[in-house]
Amino acid sequence: MKKLLFILPLIAVISFSCQKEIDWGLGGSTSTANQLLVKINSKTGTDSTLLEYFYDANKRIIREKTTGMAAGQDLGNDLVINRNSSGIITSTIQKAAALTAAGIDSVVTRYNYSTATSRYTSSVFDLAIPGFAVTDSAVYTYDANGRITSDAHYLAIGGLPIPLPPILALRNTYTYSASGTNLVNVSQDAATTPGGPLSPVSAQVFTFDAKSNPLIIQNEAVLLARTGLYNANNPAKAVVTNTVSPANDFTMDYTYKYNAAGKPDSSYGTRTPGGAITASKYFYQ
């Protein structure tokens, strides 16, 4: 039981590493409409973060690199995205300061894709932790329009006195705007005991501006746990609810300065409660 309680937060680190302090999926600087987002510089108080994007010759994202600190925490994270000749994601390799601190060099996630339906069906990654081994398998569900509506995560744990077979441990649910162009609600349900029922643990509700999000990768954004990159527009407000610990609830309000292409050039995000302000500058080339 204690090992499971250790593993679940670690799975969360892998799935959502660095997202807490970074405004995923925004863009900026003076640019033309066809330029790519390559860098976001953000600053909150004395903390600063650099987020970089890299692309292949077909302008498909193949790497995301984060450097910086937040409240003394190293946010270093490097996500390499491997694609086949058709552009389908086959695997990712993630290295992060948080993983290194847990004794893990890297995490390789493999993706299964159905050519018959043109959809990603599942993904899996393994963790080798001293004393036991963990396998996380995710299964994706779609709506009639081909949008991912949920991913269910099954954990199998070896090395326990009684090995734990695959059990449903976490489900992320995705709700879209009426137009289908933005993710307006993302919620998480998790089991608190091995094999127990899922119950709500957190949720994020978004409203948007009417301007263009410069980096849009649609369903791939859900696969990569970078849901802000799904949206056609930029978030104007995010309400984050922590069901397990309501004292950690907060709201982010965003204001933007836009470039000639109608994309963000800079932004200010204000957190309530607390009043912390994150100033960001966005660059294309």
State what each model feature region is.
Residues 1-4, 20:
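Positively charged n-region of N-terminal signal peptides that target proteins for export
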Residues 5-9:
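Sec-dependent signal peptide hydrophobic core
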Residues 14-17:
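C-terminal motif of bacterial Sec signal peptides marking the signal peptidase cleavage site
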Residues 19-285:
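Buried hydrophobic residues that stabilize the cores of well-folded domains
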